Amino acid sequence: MIIDETHGEVIVGADCEVFETAILTGPLTIGDGVYIGPYAVVGAPAQHRGSYPCGVGSPHRAEGVVIRDGACIREFVQVHQGIIRPTIVGEDCLLMAGAHIAHDSQLGAGVTMGSFSILGGFTLIDDAATFGQGVVTHPWTIIGERAMIGLNSSVVKDVQPYAKVAGAPARLLGSNTRKDAALPSDYSEDLLSDSVWERYARLADSQREAQGLWAWLDHS
């Protein structure tokens, strides 16, 4: 592997498999049992106008990347550093070949991203959401728990938990009817527990806080 610690330390956990052509740039923390495939780039600076490494021309340092235990990052995946919060890939996530995780995006546990899916900056994805191949999200989007996004969809607004959406722009098609979701095909907010909506509300609160900080940084 190629390691760049110019702007921060690279920490690799136990029992990881990292191909020699992968590029790891700090600040970066990788948990245990993580797979990083050929030509993956993890920790590159944010794609945003401004100075390296922060990307907004401010004195604030990059917030880095956290890859949690058991994540699988396939060949040619890109994961960029956060600017105001760490970019996070959660436990047991599967990022298929060519997926792009933009700066400040955060993925919960068990998220699946199809090949060549692209997240806009600051995207938040809750646990066990699934992206088909070629999905694109608008910056600042929130994807709820166990949501299903159909292939080649363009997601321009938040997706509620357990929803199934597809299209360009993506539209609600019903519930995620996969066996592990255990919902009827017709989507209704009343089907979901209070705890699911509480999780979704916490994501929204986190996003509003980040938007306030971002506005301050961008005009300071």
Located regions from the model:
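Intrinsically disordered, low-complexity terminal regions
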Residues: 183-220
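Amphipathic alpha-helical blocks and their helix-capping loop/short-beta junctions
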Residues: 168, 176-187
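Structural signal for interior beta-strand "rungs" in well-ordered beta-sheet cores
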Residues: 1-172
